[in-house]
């Protein structure tokens, strides 16, 4: 079991080193992909330093950050509340270009409105099924807004 953890730490270090070039600002090609991709795949960091399985999620790229609406009971939200805000975000596919970010649960009503507007266009084929859940969820606390700021 110790060997597996060691291997995971080595993999994590390799990912960290591969993202070093984007530590201060996202590469222009990555920004372009964020502006055109339908999905991001978010892995949150576990207590032991390993990464969760990437989860596909709808997102908004706005003012240099990635925003998602999620259940406050989701692992990504729980880990942020528990002081582990670090995430790895892959763009477009699980093995797409990726960067590290810090998540924060935020109260930004204007950004929520922007997110809902963008989702209505970006995910038009499925929006009718989910719109009420998103709108009511942000109002009654069944959804929280997470802002991921690139490291």
Write out the residue ranges for each language-model feature:
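Short, P/G- and charge-enriched loop/turn segments at secondary-structure junctions
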Residues: 28-30, 45-46, 131-136
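Bacterial N-terminal signal peptides that target proteins for export
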Residues: 2-12
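Short, structured beta-strand-loop surface elements
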Residues: 73-151
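A short linear-motif detector with a strong N-terminal bias
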Residues: 19-22, 36-39, 46-47, 65-69, ...
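Short beta-strand segments
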Residues: 37-72, 87-90, 98-100
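Bacterial N-terminal signal peptides
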Residues: 10-20
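N-terminal helix-cap/turn-to-beta initiation motif at the start of protein domains
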Residues: 31-35
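Boundary at the C-terminal end of the N-terminal hydrophobic targeting segment
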Residues: 23-27
């Amino acid at each position: 079991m110790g060997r597996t953890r060691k291997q995971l730490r080595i993999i994590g270090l390799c990912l960290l080193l591969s993202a070093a070039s984007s530590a201060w600002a996202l590469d222009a090609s990555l920004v372009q992909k964020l502006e055109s991709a339908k999905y991001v795949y978010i892995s949150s960091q576990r207590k032991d330093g390993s990464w969760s399985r990437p989860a596909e999620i709808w997102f908004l790229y706005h003012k240099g950050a990635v925003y998602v609406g999620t259940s406050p009971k989701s692992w990504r939200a729980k880990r942020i509340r528990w002081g582990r805000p670090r995430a790895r975000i892959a763009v477009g596919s699980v093995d797409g270009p990726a960067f590290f970010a810090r998540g924060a649960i935020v109260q930004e009503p204007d950004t929520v409105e922007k997110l809902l507007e963008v989702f209505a266009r970006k995910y038009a084929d499925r929006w009718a099924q989910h719109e009420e859940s998103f709108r009511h969820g942000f109002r009654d606390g069944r959804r929280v807004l997470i802002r991921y700021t690139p490291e």
